[in-house]
Amino acid sequence: MQVIFNSRVGDASDLRDLAARRARFVMRRLTWLVPRATVQFTDVNGPRGGVDKRCQVALRTDGLGSVVVTAVARDWRSALDGALSRASRLVLRLCRRDQGRRERGQRAIPLER
C-alpha cells in the first residue's frame, strides 16, 4: 500500500514514519482493497495548544470509491489512530454492504420453469 504524507507541522519527519507504519498496520487486512492512503496533518489554531491537532485520512479503494475521514485530538498520535480506526471500519462496512447487494442481486433472479 502506498502512503502519501502531507503536513505543515514542524516535526514532520517523525510523523511521516509514524503515519506510514500505523496506516500499513491498520490496513494490513484490507491492502487488497486499498492501494493508496493519503494522510494529512494540520494544526488548526497553531501553537496555542488544546484539542486542535487534525488528521485527515483519504483512502482510495478499488471498486468502492474513496473514503475520507477526519479526527481531531489533543496530540498527533491520538488524531492519527482515531482517523485510521474510523476509516478502516468504514471501508469494512462498505465492503460488506457491497457483498450483500451482490448476494441479494443473485437471489433476485427468477428460476425458469
Task: Tell where the protein language model's regions lie, with residue ranges.
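N-terminal, polar/charged subdomain of small-to-medium soluble alpha/beta proteins
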Residues: M1-R113
